[in-house]
Structure formats: structure tokens, C-alpha cells
Amino acid sequence: GEGFFDIHLHTCFPRLPNITRSNGTYYPSPEVLIQMMNSAGIAKAVVLSTLSPECRYTIVTPEETLQICNKYPDRLVPFCNFDPRYLTNSTKANFLPLLTAYKEAGFKGVGEYIPNIYLDDPLNMNFFGQVEEAGLPLTFHLAPQTGGYYGCVDDPGLPRLEKVLKSFPKLIFLGHSQVFWSEIGILKNPDERKGYPRGPIGREGRVVELMRKYPNLHGDLSAGSGFNAISRDPEFGYR
């Protein structure tokens, strides 16, 4: 069909009137989301669930996401989610029965995965192994540090991401956020990871290198970070 497929959207049923972010913004209702998609020429979209508390003003459970997607089955695709501290808050937690149940209910992936712990934290490694076994892709958000951010933490050069990609070769990872996309080029300084670096890309950065080396790493182009990565040097971006 015609139109775009957007792999990263958030929505929820309306909350109480004053339940918003501190700046007054909030997720669109399903009806408003569909209107936004129509006006942007988006045919289908993935709706993400968010369960980790970091930087949230509300939690969107997989069940709520599924309910919304079932109202618009030809337009919306549901992703489920967990926090790695679920069940036992240990590296022995068995997520597989729950992941399997969600997959059977029609969920097509996991995300947006945002716990603000190191990407290769043993809790994450336990969870990733089970997502790989369940055969679902995972959309993750990267953060530059613990505290003040949401998303899993990696260092400049993304060494932890490489370790994770190597450990779970059958798990499709969809990378997202400034910390991820700023490394489409070589970082001039570590602070660039927190923003939207501008200008032409001389040498290929770590994201490009990791994508070439690990076929299980894909890019989520949503939001300013993905758009900036592709558009800051159009010739490089489209290549």
C-alpha cells in the first residue's frame, strides 16, 4: 500500500486532566494519533509500551497497547515490554512464558526498552537472551549516564552495544536516541552524545561500523536524533 510505516509511536487512553509531563505535554489519545498519522501520510505504525519508570509521567502497559491496536488493526502494530526487574528482580527471572503469551496475543516486538542501567547489566543480559529465544525484535533507547535520563547506558564508542550484539546474534536490535545516532560519525567530544551533532560526516562512526559488522543491528529513524543523523550530511545519510 501507499504511505509510510512509522516504527516508533506512543499513545494511551486519556489520563486525568492534570496528569501530564511538567511542561504540560502528554501522549495523544488513539483517535488523535490516527488523525496525526493521516495528516502525515503514515499508513501503519508500531505502538510502543513503556513500563520502566525513568522520566515517565504515566505507564503504558502492553495490555493497554493491545487494546488500542485492536481498535485500529489495519493501522497499528503492538509492541509489548518489560522492565528487567520484573518477576524476581534478579538474573534468574524467567520472562519466556510471558513473552510467549504476548507473542501469541499478537505482539510483534518489544519496546521501547528504557531502563536506566548499563546496557550489558546482567539483568539486561538475562532479558535479552529470552527475547532472542522468543523471536521478537527489540527497540531500545540509549542514555549517556545513569540519572537524569531514560534508556540503557553505554559509553562513547558504544562498547557495551557491541558486547550485546555479539552475545545475541539472532536478536534484532532497533537502535534509537541521540546517544545512538550521534555516533553515525566520529564524535568530536563525548558531549556530542547528548545532542544533535551538525555538519558533514568525514569518517564513518561506530553505528555504521557496528551495522556492517552485526546484521542484527538496525536503526530506528524516529524523532530528532534519527532525522538529524540522516539529514546532517544528506549524501552520506542516503548512501
What feature does the model see in each segment?
Residues 1-63:
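An N-terminally biased module of ancient metal coordination in phosphate/nucleic-acid-related enzymes
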Residues 4-7, 46-49, 79-81, 111, ...:
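Active-site neighborhood of phospho(di)ester-bond hydrolases with catalytic His/Asp-centered motifs
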Residues 13-18, 86-87, 147-149, 183-186:
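A short acidic, helix-capping loop that chelates divalent metal ions and anchors anionic groups
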Residues 16, 51, 116, 179, ...:
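Flexible, active-site-proximal loop/turn residues at the rims of small-molecule/cofactor binding pockets
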Residues 26-34, 57-68, 93-97, 157-162, ...:
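Alpha-helical scaffolding within the catalytic cores
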Residues 37, 69-73, 103, 165-166, ...:
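N-terminal cationic-hydrophobic initiation segments that often serve targeting/anchoring roles
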Residues 44, 52-156:
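Active-site gating/metal-coordination segments in enzymes
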Residues 108-109, 121-239:
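Catalytic pocket-lining loop regions of alpha/beta-barrel enzymes
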